[in-house]
Amino acid sequence: MEQVFSYIISLGASVMMPIIFTVIGLCIGMKFGKALKSGLFVGVGFVGLGVVTALLTTNFNDPLKAISDIYHLQLNVFDMGWPAAAAVAYNTAVGALIIPICLGVNFLMLITKTTRTVNIDLWNYWHFAFIGAVAYFVMDQSLLWGYFAAIVCYINTLVCADLTADRFQKYYDLDGISIPQPFCQSFMPFAIVFNKLFDMIPGFSKLDIDAEGLKKKFGVLGEPLVLGVIVGALIGWAAQLDIKKILFLGVTMGAVMELIPRITALFIDGLKPISEKTQELVKTKFNGKKVHIGMSPALVIGHPTTLVASVILIPVILAIAVFLPGNQFLPLASLAGMFYLFPMILPFTRGNVVKTLIIGLVTLVIGLYFVTDMTPDFTLAANQVYAATGDNAAHIPDGFSGGALDFASSLFGWVIYRGVKLSYVGMGVLAVITVAMMVINRQRIVKE
């Protein structure tokens, strides 16, 4: 069983998701050709996203490291990026069976009416395995604690996916879709709180500028493409590169800003037919009861506000991280994942660039402290995995500790981590919160 699921994970999202979507399409009554085409569109989307992400990391890692060296921005925690966190997640006893265990929990929640989300985003299950793996090592390699932490994270993420589904679907015009990805969902509470605070500030509501408004106000300078070129060139200039390389970095960042929306359109092309068929099936067979298909946030990271906020925050957070009291983490490798901060913020800010930027900055600053706090046990887990498997993704350079924005900067991950550190008292508190969330969600589902 363990080898089967390890093999499935090794296929990667670009192969795994087309197979899953083709099977789902056939199960809900789509013709084979249409189901296969939908699945392949999703797979091509993941391939394209991988190419663009590689374009960003390959070309910007060295300039960002050069900036760090030139201006003496070295901090003690080495940014290993999400691949290290995923390596820690899947190279432990917890990660080996995380998919069947979480699918089982999902099934039980569906039949007990404590969720409406069917989480088919199997690739992102590594997030649950990661917090489980950290708990596993914190508690002296206890599988009980590892699976407890993973399941608590999974259940609360499913509930949050349900709670945000209507707002998400309305804002992005994606019927029947929810986002059960804990990294994205953990920014949702910040979006709710700060959005309400902004509305209480006299005159703040007048700063209602979305990405389209930015274009009207600043003309071509408000375009994500042009903003990307400017920020990319500024990074090259700060790294003291020659004019040729500065221009190349500018065009490369601009290309990333332009290509991501086109690639995410492929996800929508693949998902739309399956989503529509699912809603049709639910209406005819299940008396109109709602069912949400849990998907990756990659589906919506091409939104113009997400692109604008991400490209502006990359240099800003790099500068702030150095001078932040008590912070030991300098985000470099993780910056390519900046786009994933915003999918669950935008439905609450309604795409307002100013609100989104401020919320994104605040959550990132808090996230840096979360990463710093989790560093000792992230390092312990990574070292144990590297010693056992030799996986280079988990190798921490000499003289450094290890960390990553995704998933160590997440509110969900940090709260569970801190709960585990409190031992059985923390377990009790986490269990009560989780059960309460399930009860609240069930009451909503039964009422509707």
Residue ranges and their predicted role:
Residues I111-T115, G294-D373:
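Hydrophobic alpha-helical bundle architecture
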Residues L56, F60, S68, M80, ...:
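Solvent-exposed, non-transmembrane amphipathic alpha-helical segments
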Residues T53-N61, F370-T379:
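C-terminal TM-helix exit segments that contain a strictly Trp-centered aromatic cap at the helix terminus
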Residues G45-A96:
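Membrane helical hairpin/interfacial module
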Residues Y71-V77, L97-L103, W123-A129, A150-Y154, ...:
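Mid-membrane cores of alpha-helical transmembrane segments in multi-pass membrane proteins
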Residues M1-V52, A93-H292, S296, G302-P304, ...:
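Signature of multi-pass transmembrane helix bundles
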